[in-house]
């Protein structure tokens, strides 16, 4: 939504107020009518508070249509308008502890004044505390216990009729429980979507190749306001009751707590995360306790709500133009905020993953000042269309790493620059490569790159690699941080005096590690290949490479086509191996490891190539149990006939041989239309008879 009007300075209060009203009304329309919010809550709150203060300082600037004089957005087209019997007001907000102390003082003073006890000492005010859900407020009307209508808040006076959609929410009773029910009951509450349900909904959206929802609140709002209630019925919406509008035919409960207990008796869903406290100290204690468990709650909340518990005290306190005096929303530090993206750098992870990182103008969000945020990967940057110079939405929730959620396209400067993934690692200068079908680009300097140093050393020392006993993570940390070891080759240059000086490393430990290093010099080619840490090359593939080529040099010099001839090596693995050995830095470290006095292994001739048999060039997959042949025997016969026996079914598979209890491989073959043979069919195939 375009915001082209220039932002006036504070020195022009008339123009500034008009601009603020325009910004807030545009945001209201996007939020309530389009269900496409384009301003973070914190930014909206900041603009709203500024307009409130401006109108307080300059009362002549207050207009009837100012956002400060109303509750929300106008009813959208497509739904029948509903006039609320009692207005659905919003709440004033508090952010700092001082705001809560001031609220409690205002309430206590007003109650004292209302009872002609001004200046006297009174007991602390009793409050009902509950959660502030991040969903959509609605009103439910029951007549003689039967659900008859549901409406959204709208502008607080007039909302939208969403009765048919709300009927699909299973947690909302269509008839109240109990024999004694009110003639009319107007229940106020929140429609929301639990985190687990939101995740499942987006999984379905992805599977159907449909647009995913940004967050549970957007999903709940969009689902509730569907013109087709059948769509709403497929969305996992929930509801919590927390307030009341109109009540006829029964007396009003004496306290807010009693009201919620009453609702539970009627079968209405009420949240159990609530408490009764006294005074400001009790309010702040509730806020802190909820904050500690916030991330573990099964739904999103953006704060807590405090309400004077006694109904008679609520009535004495009354209302201001847009909110009750007896209640306050205590909001958590904003989890989203706006700031400017000044640059995009890349960061190298311990496994070589290249991650774009946004460098930001400092912004306070989620309780901390944020200057950097992850952009995940190159595809995410493209998908979100994030550019250098953009005004971006930054999200930080709990201990989660800050991330850039999106950019405000209407604020994009003309010179905003697209991100370009570098071709060389910023740490070591090695080539950056991205394998087909992978979202992550990686530095190929695995043995050399300082950013990957600790991971490379740890992997090299693993039991299934060179098995260097005594070289654990803490020792590796010291060796790297003291700059004693940069590559695996440096391990074999370590001396007794150097090791003995390490923290918590006695002479015996030093000698034991030296003995392990000496032992590790005599290994096998398969262990050495595995120890190099080549991506996608596990222990089994390392053995296949060693068996196929016989020595290291042919592997290092092999083309992708030659690598594809190795058993169980597919295009992605072949590309990964080829990239690793194509990087000159890796070859240098390998030569250092093979230097005299360093690592050795017995080498042999390459495995003889299978003669061109009847199945030369064919790929066969075995699955299940054959009646007379073991898996190994069948594999040996197929390989002798020139076939490649693969471990998984793909479009490149020519035949699948299936025995008893064949599983997913058989299903995959049938799905792809690949010929499936039994044991007799296998024998015919080996005899040259194509099924």
UniProtKB/Swiss-Prot annotation:
Enzyme superclass (EC): ligase
GO molecular function: DNA binding; DNA ligase (NAD+) activity; metal ion binding
GO biological process, one term: DNA replication
Cofactor(s) required, per the database record: Mg(2+); Mn(2+)
InterPro entries: BRCT_dom (IPR001357), BRCT_dom_sf (IPR036420), DisA/LigA_HHH (IPR041663), DNA_ligase (IPR001679), DNA_ligase_AS (IPR018239), DNA_ligase_CS (IPR033136), DNAligase_adenylation (IPR013839), DNAligase_N (IPR013840)
Residues holding NAD(+): 41-45, 90-91, 130, 153, 190, 307, 331
Disulfide bonds: none
EC annotation from Swiss-Prot or TrEMBL: 6.5.1.2
PANTHER family associated with the record: CHROMOSOME TRANSMISSION FIDELITY FACTOR 18 (PTHR23389), DNA LIGASE (PTHR23389:SF9)
Protein name listed in UniProt: DNA ligase
Species name: Burkholderia cenocepacia (strain ATCC BAA-245 / DSM 16553 / LMG 16656 / NCTC 13227 / J2315 / CF5610) (Burkholderia cepacia (strain J2315))
């Amino acid at each position: 939504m375009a915001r082209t009007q220039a932002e006036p300075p504070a020195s022009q209060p008339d123009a500034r107020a008009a601009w603020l009203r325009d910004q807030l009304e545009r945001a209201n329309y996007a939020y309530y009518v389009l269900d496409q919010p384009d301003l973070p809550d914190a930014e909206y709150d900041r603009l709203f508070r500024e307009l409130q203060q401006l109108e307080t300082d300059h009362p002549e600037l207050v207009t009837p249509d100012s956002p400060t004089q109303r509750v929300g957005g106008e009813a959208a087209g497509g739904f029948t308008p509903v006039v609320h019997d009692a207005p659905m007001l919003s709440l004033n907000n508090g952010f700092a502890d001082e705001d809560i102390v001031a609220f409690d003082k205002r309430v206590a003073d007003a109650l004292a004044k209302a009872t002609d006890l001004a200046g006297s000492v009174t007991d602390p005010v009793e409050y009902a505390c509950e959660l502030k859900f991040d969903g959509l407020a609605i009103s439910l009307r029951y007549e003689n216990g039967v659900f008859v209508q549901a409406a959204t808040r709208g502008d607080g006076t007039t909302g939208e009729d969403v009765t048919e959609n709300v009927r699909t929410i299973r947690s909302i009773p269509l008839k109240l429980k109990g024999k004694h029910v009110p003639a009319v009951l107007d229940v106020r509450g929140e429609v929301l979507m639990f985190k687990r349900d939101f995740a499942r909904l987006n999984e379905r959206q992805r599977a159907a190749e449909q647009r995913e929802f940004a967050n549970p609140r957007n999903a709940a709002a969009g689902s509730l306001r569907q013109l087709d209630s059948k769509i709403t019925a497929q969305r996992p919406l929930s509801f919590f009751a927390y307030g009341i509008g109109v009540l006829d035919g029964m007396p009003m409960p004496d306290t807010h707590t009693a009201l919620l207990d009453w609702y539970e008796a009627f079968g209405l869903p009420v949240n159990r995360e609530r408490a009764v406290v006294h005074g400001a100290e009790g309010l702040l204690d509730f806020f802190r306790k909820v904050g500690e468990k916030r991330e573990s709650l099964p739904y999103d909340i953006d704060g807590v709500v405090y309400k004077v518990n006694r109904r008679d005290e609520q009535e004495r306190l009354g209302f201001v133009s847009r909110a009750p005096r007896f209640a306050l929303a205590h909001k958590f530090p904003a989890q989203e905020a706006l700031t400017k993206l000044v640059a995009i750098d890349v960061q190298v992870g311990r496994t070589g993953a290249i991650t774009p990182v946004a460098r930001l103008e400092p912004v306070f969000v989620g309780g901390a000042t944020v200057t950097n945020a992850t952009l995940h990967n190159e595809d995410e940057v493209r998908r979100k269309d994030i550019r250098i110079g953009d005004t971006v939405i930054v999200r930080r929730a709990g201990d989660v790493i800050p991330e850039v959620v999106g950019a405000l396209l209407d604020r994009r400067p003309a010179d905003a620059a697209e991100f370009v993934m570098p071709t060389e690692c910023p740490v070591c200068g090695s080539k950056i490569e991205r394998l087909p079908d992978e979202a992550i680009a990686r530095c190929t300097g695995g043995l050399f790159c300082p950013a990957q140093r600790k991971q490379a050393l740890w992997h090299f020392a693993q039991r299934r690699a060179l098995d260097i006993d005594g070289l654990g993570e803490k020792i590796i940390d010291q060796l790297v941080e003291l700059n004693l070891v940069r590559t695996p080759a440096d391990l074999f240059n370590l001396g007794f005096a150097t090791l003995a000086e390490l923290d918590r490393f006695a002479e015996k430990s030093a000698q034991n590690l030296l003995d392990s290093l000496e032992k590790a010099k005599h290994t096998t080619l398969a262990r050495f290949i595995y120890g190099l840490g080549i991506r996608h090359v596990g222990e089994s593939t390392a053995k296949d490479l060693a068996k196929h080529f016989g020595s290291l040099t042919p592997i290092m010099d092999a083309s992708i086509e030659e690598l594809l001839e190795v058993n169980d090596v597919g295009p992605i693995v072949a590309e990964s191996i080829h990239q690793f050995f194509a990087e000159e830095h890796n070859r240098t470290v390998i030569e250092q490891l093979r230097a005299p006095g360093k690592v050795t292994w017995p080498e042999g001739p390459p495995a003889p190539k299978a003669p061109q048999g009847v199945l030369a060039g064919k790929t066969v997959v075995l699955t299940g149990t054959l009646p007379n042949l073991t898996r190994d025997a069948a594999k040996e016969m197929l390989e002798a006939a020139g076939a490649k026996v693969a471990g998984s079914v793909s479009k490149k598979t020519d035949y699948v041989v299936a025995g008893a209890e064949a599983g997913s491989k058989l299903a995959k073959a049938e799905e792809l239309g690949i010929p499936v043979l039994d044991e007799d069919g296998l024998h015919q195939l080996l005899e040259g008879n194509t099924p």
